[in-house]
Amino acid sequence: ETFWYSEERMNLIEELKNYCDINNPVGALMLSGEWGCGKTYLIKTKFIPSVKDTYVFVCISLFGIDSLDKLRVEVKKKWLEKASEFDSLNGTKVSRVADSCRRIFDTIKDRLPENWQKKGEVVSSIMDLINFMPISNRMFEKKVILVFDDLERTNISCTDLLGCINDYCENQGFNTIIVANEEKIKDRSDNELSYREIKEKIVQRVIPFVPDYEEVVSNSIELMSCGIEYKGLLRKNEKLLVKILSGDFNDNAIIEQYKAKNYKLGSNKEREEYQKEEEELRKLLAQRPHNIRSFKCAIQDFERVYNKLVKEDIQDCSNWLLSFICLMMTNKAGLLQKITRYGHLFWYLNVEKLYPELF
């Protein structure tokens, strides 16, 4: 999986480098973007390799972590794993990290109950001793950068989570990068004002991330393993595929067209009902997905449909392709209407609203 990034992406990487260069940062750096837009991919395959000789990166996924204690253990575990890798890469015969753990165990072993001492091999494992291990913002003379990913996917409250991250940044001196979908954090926050206030104290800067959709689509097509004819179909429709993924539609025009078509003079509907319909449409358009993973899955899945269409001697499959991609993107985003009492007819109305002229 490879995506190339434009000059704007390179500037973003420079911003990340500049933050890592700061000594004793006053706050964390947040890289914010929609789910599936390539944030983590950029960090792990573009940014980290570009500075791997200067810094040590400890990456922690917050997905599914439901307590601060578990988070602290996970941070230490990832730190220890990285330290062990570092030792191995430098040819150290016995990991200094393991030696540290053994020394700590020897210190506490004498204080354990006798029946625990007999089962010392269980307690003496590195993972059992994580809570006794101090971690440092330096690892073998290199600065350690903490990277917290999937901030919005944890079950810990935003306030508690950011407070914990702030402890690493402010009190322990770690440069800290947060990778998140900030809009989803706001959606799940019980008190958005509280989140905004604590974010202002803890997050030094927020960098919005928007991928280069033209390059994403182009590389997705060129790197895809598929039949020559099917790849030709994708290339033929590349500009429209970019339009679908980027969501490059005139939403104001869509709303005006909807109003002209549906708002009838002399109708029994009240003004408030029309306003409610318009607000619902605006909300739907604001949720138009840009998920790269969903897009890649859709163009891969359509190849089977394409092969069936070819067997049926259907000459031009472009409309089928575009409609399928629109439908799958909408479905993956959970935006398909499923009103069973009307059958299947009304399932696709949202797709038509999101992707006019293409579905």
What are these regions (language model features)?
Residues 2, 7-24:
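Pre-Walker A adenine-sensing motif
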Residues 26, 36-37, 63-68, 182-186, ...:
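Conserved nucleotide-binding/hydrolysis micro-motifs of P-loop NTPases
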Residues 27-28, 33-34, 40-141:
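P-loop NTPase nucleotide-binding core
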Residues 138-183, 190-193:
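Conserved Walker B catalytic segment
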Residues 184-203, 221-222:
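Short regulatory helix/loop adjacent to the ATP-binding pocket of P-loop NTPases
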Residues 203-274:
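Conserved small helical "lid"/interfacial subdomain of P-loop NTPases
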Residues 287-298:
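The conserved phosphate-sensing helix
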Residues 296, 300-359:
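Extended alpha-helical coiled-coil/bundle linker/stalk regions that scaffold oligomerization
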